[in-house]
UniProtKB/Swiss-Prot annotation:
It is found in: Cell membrane. The keyword Transmembrane applies. The chain crosses the membrane at residues 112-132, 138-158. It comes from Saccharomyces cerevisiae (strain ATCC 204508 / S288c) (Baker's yeast). It holds the Pfam family DUP. Present with 259 molecules/cell in log phase SD medium. Members of the DUP240 multigene family are specific to S.cerevisiae sensu strictu. Cells lacking all 10 DUP240 proteins show no obvious alterations in mating, sporulation and cell growth. This is Pheromone-regulated membrane protein 9. GO terms for cellular component: endoplasmic reticulum; plasma membrane. Belongs to the DUP/COS family. It is a multi-pass membrane protein. May be involved in endoplasmic reticulum exit trafficking of proteins. Residues 133-137 are extracellular.
C-alpha cells in the first residue's frame, strides 16, 4: 500500500472511530469491509462513501430517536389501553400471599381501625402496669366504652357493601361495555378498574377493595338479586304508548315543558336491566357449555 493511500486509510479510520453515531464495533467493521481491495482506495471514493455512511447512520438514529420520543410522549399523555390493562391486571389475590395478610393490610390502612387498635393497646398497657389504682379503673371503663362502638363501626365498614350510586353506575357501564362471561377474564379487568375508582374517589382507603374478581361479580349479583326486570321491547313499547298518551293530554308546549323533570346522569333502572340481561345470557351459555342438553331449564 502506497504512503498516500495509507494516509487516507488512517484518516478515514480515525473519523469513523470518532463518529458517535456508530454504536457498535460491528457497524465499524462493516464500513471497513468496503476497503478490503485496492480498487477502492481512491481518495474521492473514500470520502464520498464515508459521507454517505454517516448520513445514512444519522438518518436511522434520528428516526429511532423521534419514534422513541413520540412513544414516550404518547405513553405519558394517554391513558393505558384496554389491552395493556388486561395484560397487567394485578388484583389483591395476586399481590398478597394470603387473605390474612390482605386483611391485616386493609385494617392498618383504615383510620377508624387504627384508632380502635390504639385504644385497645392503651387499655391493655394500663391494665398491666396500673391495675391497682382507682384512676386506672375509671379510665379503663372510659376506654372500653369507646372501644365497643368503635368495633361496631369497623365491622360495619368492612362488611357493608359500597352504596355509592355513581360507583354502581360505573360498574354497570363497565359490564354493559365489556359484556363479561361468567368465568371470563373481563371480570379481572372490571374488578381492577372498580378498585381504582373507589380509591381515586375517596370511597375506600386502598385500591384493594375487592380481593378477587369473584367478589366483584358477587357484588353485582347482589344488585340484581330479587329484582323483576321487564324486557327492553316491552319497556320501549310502553314508553311509546306513554308518550302518545302524554301528547294527547299535554296541552300547550309550555305546559309540556313544565311537566318534564330533569334527571342527572343515566337511568339507573335501565342500566340495571341491560346488565341483568347480559348476565342472564352469559349464565345460559356457561351452563350450556358445562352441561349440554339442559336448554329446557332456561
Amino acid at each position: 500500500m502506497s504512503p498516500q493511500y495509507h494516509f487516507y486509510f488512517v484518516s478515514f479510520r480515525n473519523l469513523v472511530l470518532n463518529e458517535k453515531c456508530l454504536r457498535s464495533k460491528k457497524q465499524v467493521m462493516k464500513s471497513f469491509n468496503w476497503y478490503k481491495t485496492d480498487r477502492y482506495f481512491d481518495p474521492h471514493n473514500i470520502l464520498q462513501h464515508h459521507s454517505r455512511a454517516i448520513e445514512k447512520t444519522r438518518y436511522k438514529l434520528g428516526m429511532q430517536t423521534s419514534s422513541e420520543s413520540t412513544d414516550a410522549k404518547s405513553d405519558f399523555l394517554d391513558e393505558p389501553s384496554a389491552y395493556l390493562i388486561e395484560k397487567n391486571v394485578a388484583l389483591p389475590k395476586d399481590i398478597f400471599g394470603s387473605y390474612l395478610s390482605y386483611w391485616i393490610y386493609e385494617v392498618t390502612r383504615h383510620k377508624a381501625a387504627v384508632i380502635l387498635l390504639v385504644l385497645i393497646v392503651t387499655s391493655i398497657l394500663l391494665l398491666v402496669f396500673f391495675y391497682n389504682t382507682e384512676f386506672c379503673v375509671a379510665f379503663e371503663i372510659l376506654l372500653f366504652s369507646f372501644c365497643f362502638p368503635g368495633t361496631c363501626m369497623v365491622v360495619i365498614a368492612f362488611s357493608e357493601p359500597i352504596g355509592d350510586r355513581e360507583f354502581k353506575v360505573k360498574l354497570l357501564m363497565e359490564i354493559i361495555t365489556r359484556k363479561p362471561a361468567v368465568k371470563g377474564k373481563e371480570w379481572r379487568t372490571i374488578t381492577y378498574k372498580m378498585n381504582q375508582y373507589l380509591f381515586d374517589h375517596g370511597l375506600w382507603d386502598t385500591p384493594y377493595y375487592f380481593y378477587r374478581d369473584e367478589d366483584c361479580h358477587r357484588y353485582f349479583l347482589s344488585l340484581i338479586k330479587g329484582r323483576t326486570f321487564k324486557k327492553q321491547k316491552e319497556s320501549s313499547a310502553s314508553n311509546v304508548k306513554d308518550a302518545q298518551s302524554n301528547d294527547e293530554t299535554a296541552g300547550t308546549p309550555n305546559e309540556a315543558a313544565e311537566s318534564s323533570s330533569f334527571s342527572a346522569g343515566p337511568n339507573f333502572i335501565k342500566l340495571l336491566t341491560k346488565a341483568a340481561e347480559i348476565e342472564q345470557q352469559f349464565q345460559k351459555e356457561y351452563w350450556r357449555q358445562e352441561y349440554p342438553g339442559v336448554d329446557e331449564f332456561f
